[in-house]
Amino acid sequence: LPDLSQSAEPDKILYEKAVSDLQKGRHEIGRLTLQTLINTYQDSEYLAKAKLAIADSFYDEGTTSSLTQAVAEYKDFKTFFEFLDEASYAQYRIGMAHFRRMEKPDRDRTQAKLAEQEFQDFVLKYPENKLLTDAEQRLREVQEVLAEGDFRIARFYFLKDTDNARRAAILRLSEIVDRYPLYSQADRSLWMLGDALAKNEKTQHLAPRYFARIVQDYPQSSYVDEAKAQLVRMNVPVPQPSPDALARLQREKEMNREKAGLVRRALG
């Protein structure tokens, strides 16, 4: 008699076969095997692993359509297995799938916006997770791209220096300084915003708050002296740097020292 057990492979064998195929780049074959496992052994201990492996296989393929499918699969995983530790990994990968599809600052912003939302969700939902530092760094990179896109438009209007153009610049710059405080040109954005507001009698009373923010939040900025001079000219008290800004500067100095130490050790 034939060995019937061979015609109905147990879930473990199916899973291991699929993983082997995926590791060898046979993504479609691996996914078919995993789907067979999911459909056949609905109470299997490998069910969650199989769902996640399908999502990972699409992510690893890396094409536009595959990354789109990966997002759908990771979201499906989270729906069914939100209670598992791997749900945080799935959330991170959703953000990364959008991150990998991001365009340059002056191109379509759809994927960058989606990546920003997913990484923000990760930071809020998993504040103690081991992937938090990576998620925060990716979020900062995404926001740099979004802010840079807005800044280029704002600068275009700012340099036109007409009333209508200044109004358009003010709208863009206001969003940058409120939404993206870690943007590499946040201090310059504050300066441009204060300058644009100061040139209109109806808005000049708003300008000091933005010059003050340069002094408070970006004490090492090249715009600090000019911002202080503007505040004095407007008879507004010059504030001190905020404790948060000083703490951030200290952290950055320590990180730079660590990087320098690593370079020195690498060079011998």
Regions found by a protein language model. Give the residues of each.
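Acidic, polar-rich low-complexity tracts and alpha-helical solenoid repeat scaffolds
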Residues: L1-G268
